[in-house]
UniProtKB/Swiss-Prot annotation:
Family matches, as CDD domains: F-box_AtFBW1-like
Domain F-box residues, every copy: 2-49
Location of the region described as Disordered in the Swiss-Prot/TrEMBL record: 369-391
Lineage of the organism: Eukaryota, Viridiplantae, Streptophyta, Embryophyta, Tracheophyta
Organism name: Arabidopsis thaliana (Mouse-ear cress)
Keyword entries, A-Z: Kelch repeat, Repeat
Spans of repeat Kelch: 100-143, 144-194
Biased composition (Basic residues): 369-385
Disulphide-bridged cysteine pairs: none
Protein name: F-box/kelch-repeat protein At4g05080
Length: 391
């Protein structure tokens, strides 16, 4: 019988590359070698043969992990092939209703329907509940880190225009600051975090303008132009290094996707990544629901995956279908696997397609000390039991 230590290192790396997000923590406890290799994966030292897009999706106020492989979109015989799976997360997060979620460098910020905040590191299995400084009916949040890799939460207080708060995970404290804005932030979730900064879509006389919040300087930049003005726009990102914008024309069947070649707090340069006329969209009177970050791209394959909600044609049914589509050049549109159903009143959100595990400790020092003490007691009890058995 083949034992774990009989496996070659290349085979182990390939196995680790296929481990679901929510199971990474269990790998660490298998053996010291696997723990070390899993850390290599986190530090991007190990490159699997097949590149999987991993991320999270929210529907019906429940968080789900998502795994998508489009590196094998076509088999050698020309037959189309896509490996897609969505899995419910069976931990404490499915015991609460989640209205929004935000991702940054392997850390998730979840907002419950009763406006409680919880930070989660899926790899380490650590959580932290965060007490709000100011109680309001509605708020918009985002999660990012500064140049020193200190994670921070930016909160927009909707009851006071121009009022914001910042939570520092290192100091466990909120700070308030006021800005006199000439714009309003779009509160429908349209933002993307790249290189330590977050770019928001603004609501102004000119639609689709962007503005950056610098988490190191803790200030907003100037208004930035996207590569287009009119139509429906959704934002995404690539490896937290490039900003991506999907633009859907209002009066034609054209879909455009642009990607940044230069990205700074006060300057953006764009290049066209994909442009296609999808005639069947007009024929079907169909438009992608892109109110949220629900698409991602594969630069190598020059394809985009869009997650979309389609309302049921049966008026007696309250559910809508969540579908996935692959779009490419020359009008290529392919409907892929169904991702299940969701309540009509809430749109599914595609959070991130480039999840990378993190070793950042997010639980508080007291909880960490108690955990170490429990582990130490278990080891001591096990050692004494082993000694007694030998006697």
């Amino acid at each position: 019988m083949t034992m774990m230590f009989d496996l070659t290192q290349d085979l182990v790396k390939e196995i680790l590359s296929r481990v679901p997000i929510t199971s990474l923590g269990a790998v660490r406890s298998t053996c010291k070698g696997w723990n070390a290799l899993s850390k290599d994966r986190i530090l991007c030292k190990a490159k699997p043969k097949q590149q999987f897009h991993q991320g999270f999706m929210l529907s019906d106020y429940r968080l789900r992990s998502m795994r998508f492989n489009i590196s094998g979109t076509f088999k050698e015989n020309g037959e189309e092939f896509v490996n897609l799976s969505v899995k419910e997360i069976g931990n404490f997060l499915n015991k609460v209703e989640i209205s929004h979620m935000y991702y940054c460098g392997g850390i998730l910020l979840c907002v419950t329907t009763d406006t409680r905040l919880v930070i989660w590191n899926p790899y380490l299995g650590q959580i932290r509940w965060i007490q709000l400084k100011t109680e309001t009916m509605y708020s918009t949040f985002c999660l990012r880190y500064d140049n020193n890799k200190n994670h921070k939460i930016l909160r927009f207080l909707d009851n006071k225009q121009g009022s914001y708060e910042i939570y520092d995970l290192k100091s466990y404290s909120w700070r308030a600051f006021d800005v006199i804005p000439k714009w309003d932030i779009d509160d429908d979730g349209q933002s993307a975090s790249v290189k330590g900064n977050t770019y928001f879509r603004t609501i102004d006389e000119t639609p689709n303008l962007l503005i950056c919040f610098d988490f190191t300087a803790e200030r907003f930049g100037k208004l930035l132009d996207p590569p287009f003005q009119h139509g429906w726009m959704s934002l995404s990102w690539v490896r937290e290094e490039k900003l991506v914008a999907l633009y859907q024309h209002l009066d034609t069947s054209m879909i455009e996707i642009w990607i940044t070649t230069k990205i700074e707090p006060n300057a953006l340069s764009w290049t066209s990544f994909l442009k296609c006329y999808i005639e069947q969209l007009i024929a079907l009177d169909f438009w992608f629901d892109i109110d949220y970050n629900n698409f991602f791209i594969d630069e190598e394959k020059k394809l985009a995956v869009v997650i979309d909600k389609v309302e049921s044609e049966d008026c007696k049914r309250s559910n809508s279908h969540i579908n996935s589509y692959i779009i490419g050049d020359d009008g290529y549109l392919k409907k892929m696997n169904s991702l299940g159903n969701t309540a009509r009143s809430y749109t599914a959100i595609m959070l991130s397609s480039c999840y990378v595990s993190s070793l950042v400790q997010i639980d508080d020092p007291i909880a960490r000390r108690r955990r170490r003490e429990r582990n130490s007691k278990r080891k001591e009890k096990k050692r004494k039991g082993t000694t007694n058995n030998k006697v």
